[in-house]
Amino acid sequence: MAGEMHFIEFSKPFIDAAKNIFETMVFSKLDAQKPIIKNDSVSRGDISAVLGLSGEVDKNGTKCQYKAMLVISFPYETYFKVASAMLGETYTSYVPDIHDLGGEIVNMVVGNAKRELKNMGYTSNMAIPSMVEGKSHSIKYPAGTHVVLIPFNSSNGELFMELCYTEVE
């Protein structure tokens, strides 16, 4: 149960950071929908930005290791609209110019979340973001994690945040 409580506490900074990044960089509000536990590895979007992180959390004076991963997935149309809003050009197809944009977004979200996580007693080491593109692509989550899927609505369309977290004893 303690791990579940830490997961809930761990999730909030990522949701808040995503909302902030989209308001300031994409000029669009994100409206979080009801989270669900994800039971498969298939992405809900066509383009996914993936970033792993690990670190320690202080639990009642005892250091506990954790590992986590954040995925933000976009349907193609949403990704093109987000790219257009951020870069000031119109995109209607997946081109090299916008390939890394999702990675930049997920990097900014995790960077913003890290500040709040630090205030909550977490240390965080970030991996390098990676991008996965294609209909019905799969995401490989860290072993032993449960994945929470948080759908978001925005003026640019829907997108999906997937977050997994586990404490390593």
Predicted regions and their residues:
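N-terminal auxiliary interaction/assembly segments of multi-subunit proteins
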Residues: M1-E169
